[in-house]
UniProtKB/Swiss-Prot annotation:
Family note: Belongs to the krueppel C2H2-type zinc-finger protein family.
SUPFAM superfamilies reported in the protein's UniProt record: beta-beta-alpha zinc fingers, KRAB domain (Kruppel-associated box)
Localization, UniProt: Nucleus
Cross-link (Glycyl lysine isopeptide (Lys-Gly) (interchain with G-Cter in SUMO2)): K280, K476, K588
Any Pfam family matching the protein: zf-C2H2_6
GO BP field: regulation of transcription by RNA polymerase II
Gene designation: ZNF283
Keywords, in A-Z order: DNA-binding, Isopeptide bond, Metal-binding, Nucleus, Repeat, Transcription, Transcription regulation, Ubl conjugation, Zinc, Zinc-finger
Protein name as it appears in the record: Zinc finger protein 283
Domain of life: Eukaryota
Presence of the UniProt keyword Transmembrane helix in the record: no
Length: 679
């Protein structure tokens, strides 16, 4: 006879194979809510043993051990144990929180067949606590069917209505049982703990937060919630000093420091620090979305995502930032937002030393060093570092864009993109640089901008040694060496290195220009082009060269300019060996060898090697003359014509340093140098 230790001292569970009557002095009880849909043919919802006086045994039923499923992740893997001394140090609210978390984890594992239907634990409760697990349905021996589990807690003093008499005559041959034998179990008189449990069934939430009005079904839940407002955090990490609301949260956090990831996905090999993360991750592969919104029918793979989504319908933003007054739907969003004001970056990469404000950002960053891309699209085979990238990519195949802007009607793949887009209309820029005061509509843009001040370039090309501030820039740069152009235009067949370039190119076919300058009325394909154009009117030049002090309106122009000082020319033509400072110059040069002229004028059919040449040419058709000689009022189609005017003005801007002789053009200056070297 196999035995296993459980909660109380001296307790053993034994599989007897058939139902036996309980010992004298013990009665079987059940929660009234669980019994509302009683049916003998399908089993009963569950019951607990009520110790009225000391005796030798109590009867509790359990699933047949022969049908247990061997799981990849067991409850023991995700359980957290306390010693008797540690348990006595916890206050009642902390004990409630601990038990709630343990039962929720166990229920999740059982529902996914990752845990067998029996529960084992150590003696972690005091004499005034009783621990009990209820099975929502029971296994019938003649069908050998493993069914689900429902967990609940009855603690201290409780009493339920007897159902044992109603079971007589319907027991024999249907169920396998377990007997709990024990030395002593304390008795209870007064009913207290059943009422909180019944609130689960009737959805009563009588505990209301005075700060934000949120309602909770249990007092312990309210205590836990109120800590988000009071910032009461007693559990401190010795590694980094960060504080947490509970010991469980601290234990979860400490795995960031240890790097421990014992849970591995069989589908893609990805590892996780916690079993619950593995369970959630596996839904990406299976496509399971068990949480559905009753308001709009949208389904989610995680209950947390459903909770977040439902706030979109209610519009409640109960978490407010004390620094700037901005309100959020969720406490986690507020916590992340507050880091913008404090500038705290506790998550540091051991590989390159880069620090991050959020743990998930560090996890994402580390994949740049490993190059691991476990998420592969089954349609086109493209692989991604993160699951959310795969999810967003798959929308390109379906073409689904459910999020529409009410202002201009533009549709988006995901809600976050819509939120970012709406800031173009509202002009909201919540992310401000403390260094120069410049504000941005996206936190990502602020992070990129700050690297201009620090000069940090941690991402280096192994091919030519060029360094970049951002990993995405390195990825794009490496395509110059590999020649990879995976993004193809379906309209004309032209290929591009990045999806961003393809998107901008496609506008040439549609002719759409939704972004208009309020100053001069000129329209643009994308918002960034409008921002850059507006600097012509304002005269703003935020990008300054530290070498010579020259300022530029675009960061790209500053990068190009700095190569004049360094003399760096990493881009070399394979055909003739000529080197260039910029990749775009190499691309233009290569067209000399291929004679490619992909830019065609729709007015006369003439083709050009670059878009710039086409733009200049089109001015002949439109008659547009942007460049004016202020002295004479004469206008020109292109800026190079202004250089001609130097012959009339006697302007000689290029001077030879050796003798001081001045020249109209740089070519004359170079000829002078060659002559001196010959002499």
């Amino acid at each position: 006879m196999e035995s296993r230790s459980v909660a109380q001292a001296g307790v053993q569970w034994c599989d007897l194979g058939s139902l036996q009557a309980p010992p004298p002095g013990f009665t079987l009880f059940s929660c009234l809510s669980l019994l509302s849909s009683w049916d003998y043919s399908s089993g009963f919802s569950g019951f607990c043993a009520s110790p009225i006086e000391e005796s030798h045994g109590a009867l509790i039923s359990s699933c047949n051990s022969r049908t247990m499923t061997d799981g990849l992740v067991t409850f023991r893997d995700v359980a957290i144990d306390f010693s008797q001394e540690e348990w006595e140090c916890l206050d009642p609210a902390q004990r409630d929180l601990y038990v709630d978390v343990m039962l929720e984890n166990y229920s999740n594992l059982v529902s996914l067949d990752l845990e067998s239907k029996t529960y084992e634990t150590k003696k972690i409760f005091s004499e005034n606590d009783i621990f009990e697990i209820n099975f929502s349905q029971w296994e019938m021996k003649d069908k050998s069917k493993t069914l689900g589990l429902e967990a609940s807690i009855f603690r201290n003093n409780w009493k339920c209505k007897s159902i044992f008499e109603g079971l007589k005559g319907h027991q024999e041959g249907y169920f396998s049982q377990m007997i709990i034998s024990y030395e002593k179990i304390p008795s209870y008189r007064k009913s207290k703990s059943l009422t909180p449990h019944q609130r689960i069934h009737n959805t009563e939430k009588s505990y209301v937060c005075k700060e934000c009005g949120k309602a909770c079904s249990h007092g312990s839940k309210l205590v836990q919630h109120e800590r988000t407002h009071t910032a009461e955090k007693h559990f401190e990490c010795k590694e980094c000093g960060k504080n947490y609301l509970s010991a469980y949260q601290l234990n979860v956090h400490q795995r960031f420091h240890t790097g421990e990831k014992p849970y591995e996905c069989k589908e893609c090999g990805k590892t996780f620090s916690w079993g619950s993360s593995l369970v959630k991750h596996e839904r990406i592969h299976t496509g399971e979305k068990p949480y559905e919104c009753k308001e709009c029918g949208k389904a989610f793979s995680r209950g947390y995502h459903l909770t977040q989504h439902q706030k979109i319908h209610t519009g409640v933003k109960s978490y407010k930032c004390k620094e700037c007054g901005k309100a959020f739907f969720w406490g986690s969003s507020l916590a992340k937002h507050e880091i913008i004001h404090t500038g705290e970056k506790p998550y540091k990469c051991k590989e390159c030393g880069k620090a991050f404000s959020r743990g998930y950002q560090l996890t994402q960053h580390q994949k740049i060093h490993t190059g691991k891309k476990p998420y592969e699209c089954k349609i086109c085979g493209k692989a991604f570092c993160w699951g959310y990238q795969l999810t967003r990519h798959q929308i390109f195949h379906t073409g689904e864009k459910p999020y529409e802007c009410k202002e201009c009607g533009k549709a988006f793949n995901c809600g976050s993109s819509l939120i970012q887009h709406e800031r173009i209309h509202t002009g909201e820029k919540p992310y401000e640089c403390k260094e120069c005061g410049k504000a941005f509509s996206r936190g990502y843009h602020l992070s990129q901008h700050q690297k201009i001040h620090t000069g940090e370039k941690p991402f280096e090309c192994k091919e030519c040694g060029k360094a970049f501030s951002w990993g995405s820039s390195l990825v794009k740069h490496e395509r110059v060496h590999t020649g990879e152009k995976s993004h193809e235009c379906k309209e004309c067949g032209k290929t591009f290195c990045s999806g961003y370039q393809l998107t901008r190119h496609q506008v040439f076919h549609t002719g759409e220009k939704p972004y208009e300058c309020k100053e001069c009325g000129k329209a643009f394909n994308c918002g960034s082009s409008l921002v850059q154009h507006e600097r012509i009117h304002t005269g703003e030049k935020p990008y300054e060269c530290k070498e010579c002090g020259k300022a530029f309106s675009r960061g790209y122009h500053l990068t190009q300019h700095q190569k004049i000082h360094t003399g760096e020319k990493p881009f070399k033509c394979k055909e003739c060996g000529k080197a260039f400072s910029w990749g775009s110059s190499l691309v233009k040069h290569e067209r000399v060898h291929t004679n490619e002229k992909s830019y065609e004028c729709k007015d006369c059919g003439k083709a050009f090697g670059s878009g710039y040449q086409l733009s200049v040419h089109q001015r002949f058709h439109t008659g547009e003359k942007l460049y004016q000689r202020k002295e004479f009022g004469k206008t020109f189609t292109c800026g190079s014509k202004l250089v001609h005017e130097r012959t009339h003005s006697n302007d000689k801007p290029y001077k030879y340093n050796e003798c001081g002789e001045a020249f109209l053009w740089t070519t004359y200056s170079n000829e002078k140098i060659d002559t001196d070297e010959t002499l």
